[in-house]
Swiss-Prot record:
Official protein name in the record: RIB43A-like with coiled-coils protein 1
The keyword Magnesium is annotated on this UniProt entry: no
Pfam families reported in the protein's UniProt record: RIB43A
Family recorded in the similarity comment: Belongs to the RIB43A family.
Subcellular location: Cytoplasm, Cytoskeleton, Flagellum axoneme
Subunit text: Microtubule inner protein component of sperm flagellar doublet microtubules.
Any one Gene Ontology cellular component term annotated for this protein: axonemal A tubule inner sheath
PANTHER family per UniProt: RIB43A-LIKE WITH COILED-COILS PROTEIN 1, RIB43A-RELATED
Organism: Homo sapiens (Human)
Biased composition (Basic and acidic residues): 8-21
Coiled-coil region(s): 82-111, 216-304
A biological process from GO: flagellated sperm motility
Keyword Coiled coil: yes
Length: 379
């Protein structure tokens, strides 16, 4: 087969691409709920979103600056604490080394002066005597004798002067070191105060800038709100003027009752234009009320007559009931008298029968011996 390259029409391709773009835009409009809902001000919503993002960015920058300043403060404090700890440790180390190297007891100049065994360690005064076995008369050193007392006193006084001068020098050096330490502490405190002042000034400037930006944003929002309220007032004033014009030129304020009649249905009434009833309507209503009043009066009269009849019938019924009750009481009295006489007769007869039984039939009463003859065995 031959490979034949077909040429495409550029206009047709452009038209197809344009149709595709229009279809995409239409689908975007249809499927985007926020743009499809009627009554949404997209520009205002976008402005609000932009304001909120700027406000959040300003807050984040403020928090970041505050966090950075806090980190700097912490780093400075840690550095100062570390330097102070290193300085204290080095000073203690140097003091300990000096004591170990320079202030040993055996190396002290006064050790030989205050040594309690120095007298016994010294050599005797006379060493020329070469007798190997001297007697008691040749003793050269006795207990409690101090031959070098003057020399030792002079050396002790010299040592006292040396110690006093050295103590004075050490005190002066300690004062110099203390003054130097105080000067360094003051310089460090001044540097920290300057750093804190600088950071406070930076924070104040950031706060002032943020407040200025917030004030500008509030002013802009207030201006927008004022413009919106002004437009609303103007629109309301126009509506009020139009309403006043309509009320003054329409049939609402007229006294013609015909304006309340519906143009399409004469039997209907327009409530907002109704001015009251006509004299004919009022006369018809009064006539109807009079008819209703007469009917009501006749009905009341009939009810009154019926009530009178019911009362008379009730009274006659009550009289008949009273008579029947009287007759019933009389009959009950006669019945009670007859019943009483009958009961008396029965009582007399029963008494006579009981007397007959007791006097004639039950004359032989059983004794205890008679009852003991029964149930004498188990069979």
């Amino acid at each position: 087969m031959y490979n034949i390259k077909q040429s495409t029409d550029t206009k047709e391709a452009a038209a197809i691409e344009a149709r595709r773009n229009r279809e995409k835009e239409r689908q975007n409009r249809f499927f985007n709920v926020r743009n499809r809902v009627m009554g949404v001000d997209v520009q205002a919503l976008n402005n609000q979103v932009g304001d909120r993002k700027r406000r959040e960015a300003a807050e984040r920058s403020k928090e970041a600056a505050y966090g950075t300043s806090q980190v700097q403060y912490d780093v400075v404090v840690q550095m100062l604490e570390k330097e102070e700890a290193d300085r204290t440790r080095q000073l203690a180390k140097k003091v300990q080394e000096f004591r170990e190297q320079k202030q040993q007891l055996k190396n002290g100049r006064e050790f030989s002066l205050w040594d309690p065994g120095q007298v016994w360690k010294g050599l005797p005064t006379y060493l020329s005597y070469s007798n190997t076995y001297p007697g008691p008369a040749s003793l050269q050193y006795f207990s409690g004798e101090d031959l070098d007392r003057d020399t030792r006193l002079r050396m002790q006084q010299g040592q006292f002067r040396y110690n006093l001068e050295r103590q004075q020098q050490e005190q002066q050096q300690a004062k110099v070191d203390e003054n130097y330490t105080d000067a360094l502490s003051n310089q460090l405190r001044l540097a920290m105060d300057a750093q804190a002042t600088h950071l406070a000034r930076l924070e104040e400037s950031c706060r002032a800038a943020m407040m200025c930006a917030m004030a500008n944003a509030n002013k802009a929002q207030a201006a927008v709100q004022a413009g919106r309220q002004r437009c609303e007032r103007q629109r309301e004033q126009k509506a009020n003027l139009a309403e006043i014009q309509h009320q003054s030129t329409s049939d609402l304020l007229t006294e013609n009752p015909q304006v309340a009649q519906h143009p399409m249905a004469p039997y209907r009434v327009l409530p907002y234009c109704w001015k009251g009833m006509t004299p004919e309507q009022q006369a018809a209503i009064r006539k109807e009320q009079e008819v209703q009043r007469s009917k009501k009066q006749a009905h009341r009269q009939a009810e009154k007559t019926l009530d009178t009849e019911w009362k008379s019938q009730t009274m006659s019924s009550a009289q008949a009931v009273l008579e029947l009750e009287e007759q019933e009481r009389e009959l009950c009295a006669v019945f009670q008298r007859g019943l009483g006489s009958f009961n008396q007769q029965l009582a007399n007869e029963q008494k006579a029968q009981q007397d007959y039984l007791n006097s004639v039939i039950y004359t032989n009463q059983p004794t205890a011996q008679y009852h003991q003859q029964f149930n004498t065995s188990s069979r």
